[in-house]
Amino acid sequence: MEPDRADLKLLDLLQRDGRTTVQALAEAIHLSPRATLNRVRRLEAEGLIQGYRALVNRAALGEQIVVFAEIALKDQRQATVQRFEACMDRSAEVVACYQISGPYDYLVRICCPDLARYRELTDGWLDDVGLGIEKIVTHTEWQTLKEFTGFPLPQPKN
């Protein structure tokens, strides 16, 4: 089912603050709390809302470095791709991994306590022949100017 104006407003509000009360949501979309809760549950059931998470203050956790790694695989065989992607999924330091177009196959965002840990991590990946990594190009984050807080939503059709 295509989201209507009220659904899009709910999605926008919940992307900004997943702890917004049903009462506050209801007031914002001018529906009863029961009707609003039903809409939220429907959006969850339809997969438009996939979960709720806390936004953690990275600086409060202590010093960390964030690295963006462009990774090229030696080949595109399904077994190689599956092993590589499973490794990225298992690595706690990998906070995001995107398959991309261009000269590299993946863009990986990695968060480590220091460069030594990043080096240890990537050396381990390169030494694991089964992962099929040909090349890693590293870009260190100097400053986060805008962090991801939610997807842009389409305009309502009515």
Predicted regions and their residues:
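A compositional/biophysical signature of low hydrophobicity enriched in polar/charged and small residues
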Residues: 1-158
